[in-house]
Amino acid sequence: MAVDEFNITSLSMDFEHAVYSALDYLTGLGHKKIAFLGGKEYVGNHELITDARTTAYKKYMNHRKMDYKPYFKEGSFTFESGCNMMNELFNENNIPTAVFAANDVIALGAMKAIRENNFKIPNDISVIGFNDEETSAYIEPPLTTIHAPAYDMGQHGANLVYVASNLSIKTPLKAKIPCELVVRESCRRI
């Protein structure tokens, strides 16, 4: 179940547009073997929430008739999981030319595994993260990532709560905040 499927007032990032912009960037650089390293989240009685980044990645790849199954991995949203998922790809001999990670922490773990397997970033494998964590600009090479506007989310969230409570609106309000691609040095044309 995706968060959007709940019948509640909600504010979320426009994950689909964000993922599409990252994947458009990679395909524009010539990449076809694009791995996805994501995480799983659960709510309540351990009900799996479908991550919007996962859904958008699959939709994009299917729409463009690009085979993603050998390059698709889901673990958790941690550094260690990023390392493990990337190593699984190497062990299965499914070596992508690019990696799209569901967050910057996973991307950093993947970058560690890439280096440990004697590949170079971006010469051999390009990497894109998500969230634009502060450290992402200072690692080597600086990580290309999707900027998630936390401040804007807070402002819009407060406005949404105010409007919903003061106007006694019965229908749930839903809003999406745009994200933007921040191009740094972890990707290259092939």
Task: Identify the role of each PLM range.
Residues 3-190:
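Bacterial carbohydrate/catabolite-sensing allosteric modules
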